[in-house]
Amino acid sequence: MFVNSDFSDLLRLFNDNHVRYLVIGGYAVIQYAEPRYTKDLDMWISTDTNNAAAVYRALKAFGAPLVGLTEADFAEEGYFYQMGFPPVRVDILMGIPGGDFEQAWNNRNEVDFDGLVVSFISRQDLIDSKKASGRPQDLIDADNLSHI
């Protein structure tokens, strides 16, 4: 499903480090609807301190550029971290418009891709977050997801 093996490698490291993450954005839309172009892998993470430390460890093991960053940065609600360039960019978000991570985590959909279990935001939570964002592409995605 993922256009680049780096995405799978990163998700595997997140799983190995017990990171609580949800795939959101274009890849989540693709999971529930028809394929469409996406320029990045968007992940929403829990901002609790243990999870932030796990994210930092996983990113360090991945070889991500972390100069000037600390574990605490990944516990800051509203912060985001970006690495790479489209179409293999990764965006890690510590909050999304209208989102409650704990609720979304409880509603998550886990999908097994040849032994790699990936946590996706639920279809309904994805629709709600797309509507809350208000961006034109997100509103189109929400409408498409609502008619499945």
Please provide the spans of the model-predicted regions:
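Compositionally biased terminal segments of proteins
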Residues: 1-148
